[in-house]
Design a protein with these regions (language model features):
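N-terminal amphipathic, basic helical "cap/leader" segment at the start of enzyme domains
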Residues: 1-119
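Conserved beta-strand/loop scaffold segments within soluble protein domains that form the structured core
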Residues: 94-251
Length: 251
């Protein structure tokens, strides 16, 4: 086992009791995530998918873990048509079956070490749920999933569910206010049902000292349409991974 892999497994051990108190659904996937990360470690520099991104160098050093009950930029709300926007912990409580159907099943915990690391440390998350046939008026705007703090890794998780014949647009404005070297490790899981429409605009404007690594996994069903836009205006090191599964024909 490489030293940096061992370092992050030991960091998990330091926070394991605290993480154990988080929603059971998140804990359900931790054991598998632990095994995956222990087996794979970080993707190697110059490997097929990481020709220009040295993850071991980015993750090296005495990073601390930023755990939070949620971001000051969002709170849970129920909207007309049954639309829910808010924390994963609240969503699990209100819609346990829907959460169980999608969380941890779109992003590849078994084969993606970065998703495994995110799943291992995820303490909460942000959810957009648009039920069957609902149309989101305008767009949802989110300033940040978690705040930025120097010397810390913020582990950010989002779950977006747009059911059959529903429509939604999500605008991430990632403009952290903190200063100093900081990292955001993000995993977004997106489910788009049959004949549904979803657009994601992800705008980053950060400092030269910030590191942001995002893995976005999308699962599209029959006749669905998805529009993804990632705009980086100012940054330090940014890595945006997109994985799209066209699960049914005409997606």
């Amino acid at each position: 086992m490489e030293a940096i892999t061992k370092q992050y497994l030991e960091l998990f051990a330091e926070h394991s009791l605290e993480l154990r108190e988080r929603p059971q659904l998140l804990g359900h996937y931790r054991e598998g995530a632990y095994d995956t990360f222990a087996r794979l470690g970080l993707p190697r520099f110059k490997s097929e998918d990481y020709q220009r991104t040295d993850l071991a160098k980015l993750f090296a050093g005495d990073w601390k873990l930023l755990l939070s009950e949620g971001s000051p930029y969002w709170a849970s709300h129920a909207f007309p048509q049954g639309i829910f926007i808010g924390s994963l912990s609240d969503f699990v409580r209100l819609y346990p079956e829907v959460a169980k159907e999608h969380y941890g099943r779109i992003a590849s915990v078994e084969t993606d070490a970065l998703v495994a690391l995110n799943t291992l440390f995820a303490a909460d998350g942000f959810v957009v749920y648009v039920p069957r046939g609902a149309k989101m008026p305008g767009h949802i705007e989110l300033r940040s999933i978690l705040p930025s703090r120097a010397g810390h890794i913020s582990v950010e998780r989002a779950l977006i569910i747009v059911e059959d014949d529903a429509e939604a647009t999500l605008y991430f404005e990632d403009c952290p206010e903190g200063t100093g070297r900081a990292m955001a490790l993000r995993t977004l899981e997106v489910y788009v049902g049959r004949r549904a429409r979803f657009a994601l605009i992800d705008r980053e404007e950060s400092s030269a000292e910030r590191i942001r690594i995002t893995s976005t996994y999308v699962r599209q069903m029959k006749q669905s349409a998805v529009n993804l836009s990632a705009l980086t205006l100012a940054n330090g090191t940014t890595r945006n991974n997109f994985f799209i599964t066209l699960a049914e024909e005409e997606a």
